[in-house]
């Protein structure tokens, strides 16, 4: 696998973030969901609809020839319109998606580290996420300093303190 670089996400990355959201939703190839089903599900589309709103931040990983290989971004949600990993107003929730051929190559770690730094620089005290308990990415989140604060069904809500 060749190298990759990480850059800040921009408003024109909306389609790319949507692609990576579909990758994140389909982490388990045995239970893969059709793209249109993921996009029609508000639980997922919530994370990309209207990108880049005030308070949104994120990073994109690109391989050779600037081909996108992954993205990690965060978004603020209101208490009356929460995401899966909502823990409170003012706490951004992140999502991470990496193309399958680039998984286990350091892309997810690089993106996660960059987004955590970005959220910290934006003044956030914490950042949260929601992950299915069987998703191997849960180990990435644990080693990056995220800890479980709630479990519901097959999902865990995790938080990392930024200051």
What are these regions (language model features)?
Residues 104-117, 142-143:
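Conserved acetyl-CoA-binding loop-helix of GNAT-fold acetyltransferases
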Residues 93-104, 131:
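A short, internal acetyl-CoA/4′-phosphopantetheine-binding micro-motif in the GNAT/acyltransferase core
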Residues 25-48:
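Conserved GNAT-fold acetyl-CoA-binding loop/helix
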Residues 142-152:
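Conserved acetyl-CoA-binding loop of GNAT-fold acetyltransferases
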Residues 1-12, 163:
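Conserved N-terminal entry element of GNAT/NAT acetyltransferase domains
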Residues 119-132:
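Conserved GNAT acetyl-CoA-binding A-motif
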Residues 46-60:
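A short helix-loop-beta-strand connector motif used in the catalytic cores of GNAT acetyltransferases and
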Residues 63-96:
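Conserved acyl-donor/pantetheine-binding loop and adjacent beta-alpha core of acyl/acetyltransferases
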